[in-house]
């Protein structure tokens, strides 16, 4: 698995966590098997008795859909921003002014 594949898989795992409630059962099943459980397209096709191409198309469309949700709702992006601010806060624990600034940044995200 290349670094780009790993980054995409990690991103899709996060997007799945944030947006799975907005997906159909079939979409959830396909994404979960492909990205979380590392099933191949053929294994998923055999499991659901459909063609490999049907699985590929569904995963691609569903991936596009969760990316669209992220563009509109920005749940993952804001999660990443909050995580970075928390890390900065931990590093600045002795600086009250910096902590106040980070708290204000967190408030702006909400």
Curated annotation (Swiss-Prot):
Looking at the record's lineage, which domain of life comes first? Bacteria
What InterPro entries does the record point to?
A: RNA_pol_sigma_r3/r4-like, UPF0122, UPF0122_fam_protein, WH-like_DNA-bd_sf
Q: Gene3D superfamilies per the record?
A: Winged helix-like DNA-binding domain superfamily/Winged helix DNA-binding domain
Identify the SUPFAM superfamilies for this entry: Sigma3 and sigma4 domains of RNA polymerase sigma factors
Which Pfam families does this chain map to? UPF0122
Give the protein's function: Might take part in the signal recognition particle (SRP) pathway. This is inferred from the conservation of its genetic proximity to ftsY/ffh. May be a regulatory protein.
Give the family, as the similarity comment puts it: Belongs to the UPF0122 family.
Name of protein: UPF0122 protein Sca_0859
């Amino acid at each position: 698995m290349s670094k780009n594949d790993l980054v995409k898989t990690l991103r899709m795992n996060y997007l799945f966590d944030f947006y799975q409630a907005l997906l159909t059962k079939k979409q959830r099943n396909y994404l979960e098997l492909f990205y979380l459980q590392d099933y191949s397209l053929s294994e998923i096709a055999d499991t659901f008795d459909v063609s490999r191409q049907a699985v590929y198309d569904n995963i691609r469309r569903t991936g596009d859909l969760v990316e669209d949700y992220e563009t509109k709702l920005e749940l993952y992006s804001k999660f990443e921003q909050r995580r970075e601010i928390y890390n900065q806060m931990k590093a600045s624990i002795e600086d009250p002014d910096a902590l106040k600034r980070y708290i204000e940044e967190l408030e702006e995200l909400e």
